[in-house]
């Protein structure tokens, strides 16, 4: 990478970070705790969000921002059908959301009626790690069906997360996934990161995840 290109990239990221700070200030001002959910395609981002809504609906008011590369509203429609407000962001092919996109989405949500905002980033294990959004927590969903080597192959995204969901654990008897090997990789990159083994299909582990979230929202109020 040339010196000129490095300077341009740094300028873009710096501008993004400044706007991310404004997003955080806006969310803080509204008393909204926010999550940036990242994962590869098919890991279960939307399923996790729907399970979270189901578990926390009696206690928390939840809003969702859905990010997709194509002009579709499939996931946002599911959230709305579950009774929660949602905004769809179509990136036009970009492999990640950025602070500008979230800044444009926030005015479309009733922030004064939301306790927890969940942002579903574009399915990708590289690009989303580089662009801060201004959310309070970064959460990664890793599906056991993806294999146990992902922390070793995509270290950047694992280093920057605040919580890790290991999804689809109901498939462990049927796939080659060494949990100890996977956890060693995670621990090497992000020592002590809180981890939630979960199955969105069976509901196993959802209660623990939802309780952690509820406590985080309460502590921010």
Set out the residue ranges of the language-model regions:
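Canonical P-loop GTPase G-domain recognition
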Residues: 171-220
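Residues at alpha-helix caps and immediate loop-helix transition turns in enzyme cores, especially N-
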Residues: 48, 98, 150-153, 178, ...
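Nucleotide-state-sensitive switch-loop elements of NTP-binding domains
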Residues: 3-25, 29-38, 43, 47, ...
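Residues at the C-termini of beta-strands that transition into short coil/loop
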Residues: 90, 142, 199
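Active-site glycine-centered loops adjacent to acidic/histidine catalytic or metal-binding residues
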Residues: 68, 167, 199
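Conserved C-terminal guanine-recognition region of P-loop GTPase G domains, centered on the G4
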Residues: 128-135, 144-192
């Amino acid at each position: 990478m040339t010196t000129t290109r490095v300077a341009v990239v740094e300028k873009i990221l710096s501008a993004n970070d400044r706007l991310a700070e404004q997003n955080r200030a806006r969310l803080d001002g509204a008393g909204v705790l926010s999550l940036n959910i990242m994962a590869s395609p098919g890991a279960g981002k939307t399923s996790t969000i729907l399970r979270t809504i189901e578990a926390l609906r009696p206690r928390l008011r939840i809003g969702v921002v859905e990010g997709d590369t194509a002009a579709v509203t499939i996931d946002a429609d599911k959230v709305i059908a579950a009774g929660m407000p949602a905004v769809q962001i179509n990136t036009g092919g970009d492999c990640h959301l950025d602070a500008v996109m979230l800044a444009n989405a926030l005015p479309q949500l009733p922030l004064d009626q939301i306790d927890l905002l969940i942002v579903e980033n574009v399915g990708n294990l590289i690009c989303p790690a580089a662009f801060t959004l201004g959310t309070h927590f970064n959460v990664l969903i890793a599906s056991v069906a993806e294999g146990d080597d992902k922390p070793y192959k995509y270290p950047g995204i694992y280093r920057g997360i605040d919580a890790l969901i290991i999804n689809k654990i109901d498939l462990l008897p049927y796939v080659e996934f060494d949990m100890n090997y996977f956890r060693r990789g995670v621990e090497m990159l992000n020592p002590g990161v809180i981890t939630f083994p979960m199955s969105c299909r069976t509901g196993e582990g959802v209660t623990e995840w939802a309780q952690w979230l509820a406590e985080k929202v309460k502590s921010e109020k």
